Amino acid sequence: MHWHGLSQSTAPFSDGSPQASQWPIKPGEYFDYEIRPNVGEAGTHFYHSHVGFQAVSAAGPLIVEEKHGKSPPFPYDEERILFISELYNKTDSMTETELLRPYDVVRCFPGMSANETDTPEPWVMPDPSLVESCGPEVIQVDPDKTYRMRVIGGPALNLVTMGFEDHQELSIMAADGKYTKLAKTERIQIASGQRFDFLLHTKTEDELRRLGKSAFWIQMESRYRPMNVSSYALLSYNTPSDLAFNQTTDLVPPEKQPLTLPNKVYDWLEYVLEPLEPNGFPTADKVNRTVVLTSLQLIAKEGVYAAVSNRTWTETNQHRNNTPFWKREHQAGTPYLVDIFRRGDEAIPDYETTVQKHGGWDPDLNVYVAKVGEVIDIIMVNQPNGLDIGFDLHPWHIHGGHIYDLGSGPGSYNATANEEKLKGYNPVIRDTTMLYKYTPGQYVGENKNFTDQGWRAWRLHVQDPGVWMVHCHTLQHMIMGMQTVWMMGNASEITRGVSPESLEGYLNYGGDAYGNASYDPIVQHHFDYGLQQILQ
């Protein structure tokens, strides 16, 4: 289980990324995770499985409240959580099998009506004899109040744009759990892995009376899919029964869409969000090196692959020893973090050799390396190949310490031009931002001629040693290989001086740190001292 947004606050082996930071949990067993949010990490996060397609349903909100006695920087009356997810009419195993079969082509699954959740099996139509059906979510609010709306991007695949009928004055106050200066917007846009907090001030009773209604549609639409799906929820006011405009709204989608949401999504809030407080943004002269991660889809007779710079990584096949991306044999060795605890610096590639010969990537372990204290510009590039499947957008996510988001644009990345755009602007700290597509794939890259068709730039100040994932957060793309692993720091920094003898139960597959119905796990508590201090 991954604690999305709080990776840097986890105990060793608690990041939840199997084969990177821990052994997988055996069926029928369980594992105690330990996290300790730090002051300054209050915000909107979520948890989800990090295995296969499980995160489409094994996920939920994770809200870190302010330290006792401290108030949020912006006043509001109440808050609501909007957790956006997707429903597929196939099982997880069906989806994974189709993604990994030879010559498979990833397509959008058909949109489903609201009442198709009432099914005896997840891949059949509902029983028409069922009395109850699943209608839109109803979000209750009171008139003339300010609400903090916490929106969490839990979809597997889709980027979602959403608007609120007759409520277009929204103010972003936080992104990915970090407070920002207030930024006005008329709609919200969110992809897998992202979180946005915004303020919504509800209408007064007089305003509701003039409008003649007390319920308003929340309209959500997917983008960049062969079939863009529209979904709805309701913003419903609690109003006195004696008011003439008090009404009952039919819980079926409206025949006519109440809002017209734009198709253009790639410029939403770009170079707009700024941190509420200074965040230590390192300027270009502090950058030590640049790493380019190219997102592309590759086709071989074995199947279709979502790759990073012509390489793939999954929890079942780490492609160690420079094995090609199309090799399908299961190749799951010792998890990298476990190996570092066992063998120390011998389990970490030589930094100088890796950087000088391979741009920071080690072909033997299929990992990237970084030194604590260095500043790295990470440039994600979108390269279509002119084939029908070869072009998509990607929500890139980083575990561990978060990044400064330097913006995005079409074509190839130009560092000089982007630095000009950054003048007078302080980038925010994020953990998930979008690598967009700016043109339909059929118009570029003919005959498998890969060309740059979009970029996203990050600046990472390496301060959190560990074994961390950097990957596309689209679940389908993760299954197809669009993931990377980074070793940040040396062995003593990563292990923090903890001896392997005290962690033996974590270092073996099915060790005694994993419990089951017969026995409780033997847990090494890493934050006991800190928790005692807090309680005092």
From Swiss-Prot:
Binding site for Cu cation 1: H2
Binding residues for Cu cation 4: H397
Biotech relevance: Terrein shows anticancer activity on various tumors including cervical carcinoma, ovarian cancer, and head and neck cancer. The secondary metabolite acts as angiogenesis inhibitors through the inhibition of angiogenin secretion. Terrein also has anti-inflammatory activity. It shows an alleviative function of age-related inflammation characterized as an anti-oxidant and might therefore be a useful nutraceutical compound for anti-aging. Terrein may enhance osseointegration by decreasing the level of ROS and has a potentially synergistic effect on osteoblast differentiation.
Tagged with keyword Zinc: no
Keywords of the record: Copper, Metal-binding, Oxidoreductase, Repeat
GO molecular function: copper ion binding; oxidoreductase activity
Family annotation (Gene3D superfamilies): Cupredoxins - blue copper proteins (2.60.40.420)
InterPro entries: Cu-oxidase-like_N, Cu-oxidase_2nd, Cu-oxidase_C, Cu-oxidase_fam, Cu_oxidase_CS, Cu_oxidase_Cu_BS, Cupredoxin, MCO_CuRO_3
PANTHER family: FI03373P-RELATED, MULTI-COPPER OXIDASE
Protein name (Swiss-Prot/TrEMBL): Multicopper oxidase terE
